[in-house]
């Protein structure tokens, strides 16, 4: 049983080595946290407290009632893969790039350090739905890769700033300027 125990009684390792019996007897709940280098090293328990914890663990491991649900209620049906339309198609709301999209983008010469975020995908889909243009699935993925690359590069690779944050001027004076 590996866990952390909340106790208000603690001791340093050296003190515990010298008077372990007295420290355990003095604790009200039968537990002492022993610290080494300002971090908990281990917990010392009285036999009575250990028996309480083991009984509690055994009780929690048993089911709370004798009613059991049939396994069919726990089995979720396998998600049917969304079929990619053949040929050219207009962008639709549930469109998703392939699972290996980052690898494909790299093959097309577009290195994406992070996967496409749901926000980036939603913006792309919304834009192209309104346009109403038709392309093949691979062409849509190439457009998405270029779109993400351009949007990320437009901010110098930095994450977008929070427009609601209050800016704070720095007090650094560049070389060559008087302060």
From Swiss-Prot:
Residues 151-179 are annotated as: Disordered. The keyword DNA-binding applies. It holds the Pfam family DnaT. It comes from the Bacteria. The keyword DNA damage does not apply. GO terms for biological process: DNA replication, synthesis of primer. Belongs to the DnaT family. Homooligomerizes. Interacts with PriB. Component of the replication restart primosome. Primosome assembly occurs via a 'hand-off' mechanism. PriA binds to replication forks, subsequently PriB then DnaT bind; DnaT then displaces ssDNA to generate the helicase loading substrate. This is Replication restart protein DnaT. The lineage of its organism: Bacteria, Pseudomonadati, Pseudomonadota, Gammaproteobacteria, Enterobacterales. The gene is dnaT.
């Amino acid at each position: 049983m590996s866990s952390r125990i909340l106790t208000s009684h603690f001791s340093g390792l050296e003190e515990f080595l010298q008077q372990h019996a007295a420290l355990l007897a003095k604790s009200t709940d039968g537990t002492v946290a022993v610290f080494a280098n300002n971090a908990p090293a281990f917990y010392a328990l009285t036999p009575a407290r250990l028996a309480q914890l083991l009984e509690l663990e055994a009780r929690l491991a048993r089911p709370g009632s004798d009613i059991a649900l049939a396994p069919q209620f726990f089995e979720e049906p396998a998600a049917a893969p969304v079929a990619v339309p053949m040929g050219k198609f207009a962008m639709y709301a549930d469109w998703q790039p392939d699972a290996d999209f980052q690898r494909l983008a790299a093959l097309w010469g577009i290195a994406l350090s992070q996967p496409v975020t749901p926000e980036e995908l939603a913006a792309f889909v919304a834009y192209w739905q309104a346009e109403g243009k038709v392309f093949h699935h691979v062409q849509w993925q190439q457009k998405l890769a270029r779109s993400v690359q351009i949007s990320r590069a437009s901010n110098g690779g930095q994450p977008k700033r929070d427009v609601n944050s209050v800016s704070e001027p720095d007090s650094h004076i560049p070389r060559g300027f008087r302060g």
